Structures are given as structure tokens and as C-alpha cells.
Amino acid sequence: SNYFGTVGAVALDQKGHLAAATSTGGMVNKRYGRVGDAPIIGAGTWADEQCAVSATGWGEYYIRLNVAHDICARVRYAGDDLAQASDTLVMQDVPALGGNGGVIALDARGNVRMPFNTSGMYRAAIDAEGKRVVAIYRD
């Protein structure tokens, strides 16, 4: 395993404000001075009034594609829904460059999407009615 300890969160409050946060221990045996995607706004984390995203994965590819921001930009400017935007980036664009990982994403309507292209990704969600989703693997 090359990844160690990424934690991310996205939230939508009662007033409709979206927020995202990402923290990570980074890659094992990373090169001294390497900066991954987690602290880079747009690559590992992004939130605006349409969408919030926290990402984990091979940072160089997430930086190159500006993954978190691009998901929200596709929702805002291309008219993609959250599922289409996040699935395209995570399942097609990142792997096409050789990277892997996943995201947790939330839109202003409360839709949640958590795609990943690895064997598993720890993830959970809860909605306003208290419905919970907790998972590691696809099913």
C-alpha cells in the first residue's frame, strides 16, 4: 500500500453552504519535499456554492488534472450532474494518465457521490433524515 491516512470531509449546512476539507499522511517513502494534492486547493480539496469535493489518490495526477475543482467546474459550467462529473474524472481521466484514487463529492441539492478506482476506499455519508452509508469495497 502506497497511501497512508487520508481523511476527507464534505458538508452541506442548513443554509445551503458547502465545505470541504482534506488531510493526509502522504505516500510511504515519498521523496523529501514532495507536496501532494491534499494541501493544494483545487487538486485535493474544493468547495463553492455548487459542489464540494475531497480527494485521495496519487497526488501528482490529481494536481495535474486539478481533480476537485474540475469536478465542480463540470457541474457548474458543463451542466454535468455530480455523478457524471465525478465518475468521469475518477474512472476515466485519472486512470488515463496512470493514476488512481477516489473522491467524496456533495452538491448543493445534497446528492453524494463517492467513486474510486482502487480495490477499496473507506467512506461514509449521512443525510438530513439520518440515513447512513458506510463502506470500504464496492458492494
What do the PLM-derived regions correspond to, one by one?
Residues 1-139:
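N-terminal nucleophile
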